[in-house]
Amino acid sequence: MRGFMLRVAFAAVLSSNLPAGNWKLEAGSWKLTRYESVEPHMGTLVKITVYTSGEDDARRAFRAGFDRIAALDAILSDYKPDSELNRIAGIAVGTPVEVSRDLFTVLEAARELAEATAGAFDVTQGPVIRLWREARRSRHVPDEDALREAASRTGYQKLHVDRDRCTVRLDQAGMALDVGGIAKGYAASEALAAITSLGVRSSMVAISGDLAFSHAPPGTSGWRISVHDLAGEQAVPDVLQLADGAVSTAGAAEQHLDANGHRYSHIVDPSTRMGLTDDLTVTVIARNGLVADGLDTAMSVLGVERGLALIDARQDAVALLIRRTGSDVELLQSSRFQSFVQALRGPAH
């Protein structure tokens, strides 16, 4: 979740117009204070915001959230050689291997999204993604032969999940899984759940630009989240007030390679093995981060028309897209955007 609108949304959430201070609930005689904490996890900065009755409760909430994210990073990271994700690539070839519930949840969701998008979203693209990761360091587009060889070790059909047994099986040696297009959203929602389990009603977790948030802050109808900064009259407000949901944004503004007259995104199209070159930013709003994070990546690969068709066929998410062509900027929204956003507004308390 990772682009122009992503940075705008992240900044807006972290610098909410709600000042730190005491907030008295209508239904009680105790006060809530806003507390914030930042730690590095999953290769980025994670910020947690909570409203609690005191510092001790806030510290417990922060620790629960950050610890949950750290535990998930140890499972889902493709950068850590000893992560569970990387370990199964070597032992699950041809043999079903039982995995943790967290890893299974992410891989099952990824497999389902791959089916729904005919492979536009594909976590088996690890070998290809690693070539593009190296390309961003060397500032050179990957060699065609190297891309072709890497792609021969990919394909979502080669990834099998068994819900009853909680197992994963791979069809081919040399495969590498990369869940970067879905993991941060899952981690944000899981950290939020850990905080909520402590009795904290209003909290927000921001992992880079993957945002998950619970009940509205005191005295408001939602967390203020900026979704675009386009000038002029727009059908969509530039700031939304949302509660009990998640927001994820994908784009090429932060991670990209400028080469051969093109800007190649870190998001790779499995059908071409190339980084995306369209200037498209996708923001997805959903009830949970797992859904939002996966869909923004899938829609980026599918493009505007097919991406909107994908999300319009679902009931659990909506999307806002910004497409830039030269000096022209176009703002597009999925068909149920307004009604879905309205449903995520919480009553002021």
Q: What would you call each of these model-derived segments?
A:
Residues 2-349:
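Mature catalytic core of soluble alpha/beta enzymes
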